[in-house]
Amino acid sequence: DVKGPYTGSGNDNEWGQMLSEILTGIMQKNYSIIQKKYDRAVQTEHPGNTTVHSWADTEFLWMGLRSSFPNATFKLEHVIGREDPMLSPRAAVRWSLSGKHEGWGMFDEPSGAEVYIMGFTHAEFGPYGLRKEFTLFDPVSIWKQIYMQK
């Protein structure tokens, strides 16, 4: 990536730290963190117009991504949390995965292609944990990186 003019890394709000801890756990393949930190009625939104409402389905979505890139390097790029009157605590994290497509998962048969993924996760927290998660990354750009190296 080309280094841009903004070099901030966010703030130190507890909700941003909570979301970064959750994402780091997921990327370390500690999927049990979802049942520990998410509301059991979580609403999860992922690319491809995918909406699910449970721990198991949320785990499935994250496993599909991580399984395709099992040894890719995960990096927290920007972490921010916020609390305001009359609103739920919330957080946003920009993250990246960089490495080889060397596992079976959401991107089919391993190709060995070098892939860079930039992702964003926004979350809202409630009394029982993370209750809404919105994660965005571009599957088309990932497929393109895979196919251009075949």
Regions found by a protein language model. Give the residues of each.
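C-terminal and inter-domain tail/linker signature
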Residues: 1-150
